[in-house]
């Protein structure tokens, strides 16, 4: 079954699709549901409970940061990496719910870690609750981050079904089938993918989406190569990308043209993006 380019490549907050991208989307969807149910204006406090795997790695894998982003109603594409969103919430203990309403929010109290509790449906579980001024629960929802940034609410996960296959000119389910198509049609892999994507959405939209992902990836590489110090998350892990970058730049200045040097540059770009 064919998977769209945009299902495999998407813009999200790192470092993990299941521990950051998924929780951010879940928290954002929860805020959207408050709006849909006309409860948003009654909210005086929100609370997040992390279960199992998310609780065990919450700070180190950026889950808490991601949930704060989601509660703020932020989309991954709109986040400015230079802005201290979470540190401002930690300092002021104020969260701008859905980018609209400032409410009290203390990360140490309003994000709860249930490290010993694994929900039966999936190890990456989270519960969101909103309260009114009298302490009554307005909306209580449980979500799961099931991998690749995909989320499911508790009432949805038990009835998840595979989507209908996309109708594309060149369907394939393995690399061997893809290469066979390329040889038969005289097309490159990129040609096949582009033709398929253009069957799912307008060509201009495809190219714009690819360009946006490329720009974000390039910006992540550039920032990651220049950043120094320790990684966020409280684990005190030193960044490596900048050191590798300086070493490779020195080799370039010394005219050290090792044919395997390109592999080192590719590894550097991987480190740079991972550390961003």
Residues of each region from the PLM?
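Accessory "access/gating" subregions that flank catalytic or transport cores
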Residues: 204-276
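N-terminal ordered "arm"
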Residues: 16-45
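N-terminal amphipathic, basic-rich helices that act as targeting or association modules
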Residues: 174-220, 224
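Short, hydrophobic/aliphatic alpha-helical segments
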Residues: 1-12, 47-50, 263-276
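Beta-sandwich/jelly-roll carbohydrate-recognition scaffolds of carbohydrate-active enzymes
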Residues: 41, 46-192
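Flexible, glycine/charged-enriched surface loops at secondary-structure junctions
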Residues: 38-45, 78-81, 224-237
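Generic secondary-structure signature for well-ordered alpha-helical cores
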Residues: 32-39, 72-77, 133-136, 215-227, ...
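Conserved phosphate/anionic-ligand binding catalytic regions in large, soluble enzymes, centered on
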Residues: 9-27, 60, 276
